[in-house]
């Protein structure tokens, strides 16, 4: 798993934490074919990420999933036996919190992609709602993706896997990852007993609570699904104004500090 190398002065983070970029769900089961209509599969530079369709022309994912030669697939369940309504797109434009595409702060691992042409809703394709309010601590939320389901070797599934995890206090993640900046623009989510988690290949995918996208898979412990090591998710609610401004055409909009 790729080690975090964002803040040079946070050496302990560099040594201990792993980003889930080019990063299946650990401890999950095959998703119901109808429950992930907004889930997007992305390939770039030989890597894999996930994303979320939020309207017919826009996909929300992680900034660290940016790369060249990106292909975006919608309506996918089985990679080997594609659905008849699978649609493929490429980015028309990409937007980041910072114009230099950096996400040095842990609250800026977010990217908004405008597709080259609109997507048509179908049996296996539909957008997911943006959050109406932030999730409360203790909420049960859904993770999903085509990432590896093994913590010891990269074993990727043919179909996406899903699992339920819980929202935790930010302090839980601060205790798990010493040196984590005191910011409230991320969500701390997972199973403290371990065994269920996002992992390599799930980056950029959604954390779904009550039918809304509340988080974007960002990073976590060096081994996925470890005890007392929840995952770190970009908090979508805190970026709503930026998202809506970009979609409305205000490309100079900036993310919250």
Swiss-Prot record:
It is found in: Secreted. Expressed by the venom gland. Keywords: Disulfide bond, Glycoprotein, Hemostasis impairing toxin, Hydrolase, Plasminogen activation, Protease, Secreted, Serine protease, Signal, Toxin, Zymogen. GO terms for biological process: proteolysis. Disulfide bonds join 31-162, 49-65, 97-255, 141-209, 173-188, 199-224. Glycans are attached at residue 100. The active site is at 64 (charge relay system), 109 (charge relay system), 203 (charge relay system). Snake venom serine protease that may act in the hemostasis system of the prey. This is Snake venom serine protease Haly-2. It comes from Gloydius brevicauda.
């Amino acid at each position: 798993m790729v080690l975090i190398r964002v803040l040079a002065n946070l050496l302990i983070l560099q040594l201990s934490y792993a980003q889930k970029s080019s990063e299946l769900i650990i401890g999950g089961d095959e998703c119901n074919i109808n429950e992930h209509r907004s889930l997007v599969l992305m390939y770039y530079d030989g890597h894999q990420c996930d994303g979320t369709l939020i309207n017919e022309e826009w996909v929300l994912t992680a900034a660290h999933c940016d790369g060249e030669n990106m292909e975006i697939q919608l309506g996918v369940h089985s990679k080997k036996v594609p659905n008849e309504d699978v649609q493929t797109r490429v980015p028309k434009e990409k937007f980041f919190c910072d114009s230099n595409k950096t996400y040095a702060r842990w609250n800026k691992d977010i990217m908004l992609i405008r597709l080259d042409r609109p997507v048509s809703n179908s049996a296996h394709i539909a957008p997911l709602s943006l959050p109406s309010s932030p999730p409360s601590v203790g909420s049960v939320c859904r993770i999903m993706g085509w990432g590896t389901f093994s913590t010891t070797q990269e074993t990727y599934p043919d179909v996406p896997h899903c699992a339920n995890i819980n929202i935790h206090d930010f302090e839980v993640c601060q205790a798990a990852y010493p040196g984590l900046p005191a910011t409230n623009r991320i969500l701390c989510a997972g199973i403290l007993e371990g065994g269920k988690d996002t992992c390599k290949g799930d980056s950029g995918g959604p954390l779904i609570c009550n039918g809304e996208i509340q988080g974007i898979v960002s990073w976590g412990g060096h081994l996925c699904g470890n005890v007392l090591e929840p995952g770190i998710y970009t908090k979508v609610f805190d970026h709503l104004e930026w998202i809506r401004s970009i979609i409305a055409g205000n490309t100079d909009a900036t993310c919250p500090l």
